[in-house]
A protein has these predicted regions:
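Metabolite-binding pocket within alpha/beta catalytic cores that recognizes anionic/polar moieties
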Residues: 1-127
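Generic hydrophobic/aromatic pocket-lining and core-packing "Φ" positions
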Residues: 80, 159, 175-178
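Non-catalytic positions within long, well-ordered alpha-helices that form the structural scaffold/packing
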Residues: 83-87, 163, 182
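Short acidic/polar active-site loop segments enriched in Thr and Asp
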Residues: 89-90, 168, 187
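Active-site rim beta-loop-alpha module in soluble metabolic enzymes
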Residues: 127-164
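Hydrophobic faces of well-ordered beta-strands that scaffold small-molecule active sites
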Residues: 142-146, 170, 189
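Zn-dependent metallopeptidase/amidohydrolase metal-coordination segment
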Residues: 172-208
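His/Asp/Glu-rich mid-to-C-terminal helical/loop segments that flank catalytic regions of hydrolases
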Residues: 198-232
């Protein structure tokens, strides 16, 4: 890039945010960066792409690793350290999440105001609660997310427990990256794409999650494009 990247955006399961790059400059696999292993899960390409969005230098992380893949915190968060080495400031995490509130519908975008880890977990260097530095504006909703290790979707009992903790959505990512970013002195924001509702009985598959996320990608791109100037 001709300028150091100012913002990093992490694209979650099925979220295609390539439309943010008005002027793509390069794209490289995770494995091209120190300690970064290839992504293993469908819907996670496992690349870094550099370019500009509205004149703002940007790094797009396409996909991520997960705790349920059986890797430790250092391996899980190696992409965050790679982003820090590239010189990014803010890290904006996006993810697919299940809605825990009856008013949340698939395809809605939800700004994350706090993340609960469940079971309660504190990662190395984590500075207290996982509180984003910004609330991404113009989302359909705002609230607390819960992180769970996965890979199984939640049971009815687990859904009730998470609701009791005050969570309105649940996912299997973002929390480790936020913890690593904060430990590195990087500011954060997060948006969840609601891909299913846990309040209705339904048969849920990963393919369903990916399809709903893909359908919401263009709207998420537009939302993030408008918010980028605020991430300084």
């Amino acid at each position: 890039m001709t300028l150091p990247p100012r913002v990093a955006i992490v694209a979650g399961s099925g979220l295609d945010l390539g439309g943010l790059l008005d002027r793509p400059l390069w794209e490289k696999p995770f494995s091209a960066f120190e300690h970064c292993a290839p992504a293993q899960v469908a819907g996670h390409p496992g690349t870094f792409a550099a370019g500009e969005c509205g004149g703002i230098p940007l790094i797009l992380q396409r996909g991520r690793r997960h705790v349920y893949e059986g890797i430790g915190f250092d391996a899980l968060t190696a992409p965050v350290r790679a982003l820090a080495a590239m010189g990014v400031g803010p890290v904006v995490c996006t993810n697919a999440a299940g809605g825990l509130l009856p008013e949340l519908e698939p395809g809605q975008l939800r700004a994350v105001e706090r993340v609960i880890t469940w079971p309660c977990r504190r990662w190395p260097g984590q500075p207290g609660e996982l509180l984003p530095d910004w609330l991404v504006p113009a989302c359909d909703a705002t609230g607390v997310d819960a992180w769970v290790p996965g890979p199984s979707y939640e049971t009815r009992a687990e859904i009730g427990a998470l609701q009791g903790l005050g969570a309105g959505a649940v996912g299997m990512s973002t929390a480790p990256e936020m913890a690593a970013a904060r430990a590195l002195g990087l500011r954060t924001a997060a948006v969840s794409c609601i891909t299913n509702t846990c309040c209705r009985v339904q048969r849920l598959t990963h393919d369903h999650v990916l399809a709903t996320a893909r359908d919401a990608s263009a709207r998420l791109c537009a939302l993030l494009r408008n918010a980028l100037p605020d991430f300084r």
